[in-house]
Amino acid sequence: MASSSNYNTYMQYLNPPPYADHGANQLIPADQLSNQHGITPNYVGDLNLDDQFKGNVCHAFTLEAIIDISAYNERTVKGVPAWLPLGIMSNFEYPLAHTVAALLTGSYTITQFTHNGQKFVRVNRLGTGIPAHPLRMLREGNQAFIQNMVIPRNFSTNQFTYNLTNLVLSVQKLPDDAWRPSKDKLIGNTMHPAVSIHPNLPPIVLPTVKKQAYRQHKNPNNGPLLAISGILHQLRVEKVPEKTSLFRISLPADMFSVKEGMMKKRGESSPVVYFQAPENFPLNGFNNRQVVLAYANPTLSAI
């Protein structure tokens, strides 16, 4: 469903439920986290620091955790995997080397809380935050994930105590055909059409539809969004080979404009949009997904 005024999905990503009384840019002290000790992550991935000097290079950042779960009146279940997507970012938004250094030198804990009847996993980074950083984890020091999205569903029925036993930072370089909004759009306040795939994942920002596609679904109020909605059934999702939890959408070249996007290969016939999602994300397209307006830069707040 398209809506030019519905920002709820995007705002849930920007502002997940609060942890106790701590707000934005207030990092949670270690002594308030059930006496847990922070753990420093290891590293895996496609890191080439020469890329930090190339503004149009994008990377996907993910924390992969191993946790021990202790349920009340039940024995501890050890070695439960957790998938914690931090987001996709280009060098236009923040230098790659600084981002990786800040993530690797941080100390992390993991807790659980309930908000409006929904169970969340909260990952907390102990240390100094970077207020303007595009990744929420570095910007505000903590990030909430809906529990049944990031850990196996059979562990989501009761209240648990978590003990973080291993943490890996995965940095994956996006292929050269990746489309991202251009630098002036990232640092400005332009909103883009986007597809919402989950209330606790950022919307997938899309290029602007071409004029002929817009005319086919013209509406004086929210024509661009209706134009996107009218062609969602033509979009197909593909799993990116040899990448973890990374997917792509090849957009029809005759319907989408790429002039405002970052494209390393000028010969590409159509824009390709990459996004993070759980490994079991369905590949049968985007029918019935909500179309919203979203900022490319997640440090901005919706009006």
Swiss-Prot record:
Ranges annotated as spanning the membrane: none
User: Where along the sequence do coiled-coil regions lie?
Assistant: none
Q: Where in the cell is it found?
A: Virion membrane; Host late endosome membrane; Host cell membrane; Host endomembrane system
Question: Where would one find the signal peptide in this protein?
Answer: none
Which Gene3D superfamilies does the record associate with it? Matrix protein VP40, N-terminal domain
One annotated GO biological process: symbiont-mediated suppression of host type I interferon-mediated signaling pathway
* A Pfam family: Matrix_Filo
* Keyword annotations of the record: Host cell membrane, Host endosome, Host membrane, Host-virus interaction, Inhibition of host innate immune response by virus, Inhibition of host interferon signaling pathway by virus, Inhibition of host JAK1 by virus, Interferon antiviral system evasion, Membrane, Viral budding, Viral budding via the host ESCRT complexes, Viral immunoevasion, Viral matrix protein, Viral release from host cell, Virion
- Membrane topology field: Peripheral membrane protein
Among the entry's GO cellular component annotations, what is one? virion membrane
Q: How does it assemble?
A: Exists as a dimer until it reorganizes at the plasma membrane into multimeric form. Interacts with host TSG101. Interacts (via PPXY motif) with SMURF2 (via WW domains); the interaction positively regulates virus budding.
**Record comment regarding domains:** Late-budding domains (L domains) are short sequence motifs essential for viral particle budding. They recruit proteins of the host ESCRT machinery (Endosomal Sorting Complex Required for Transport) or ESCRT-associated proteins. VP40 contains one L domain: a PPXY motif which potentially interacts with the WW domain 3 of NEDD4 E3 ubiquitin ligase and the three WW domains of SMURF2 E3 ubiquitin ligase.
Q: What family, per the record?
A: Belongs to the filoviridae matrix protein VP40 family.
Which protein is depicted?
A: Matrix protein VP40
Question: Could you tell me which species this protein originates from?
Answer: Lake Victoria marburgvirus (strain Ozolin-75) (MARV)
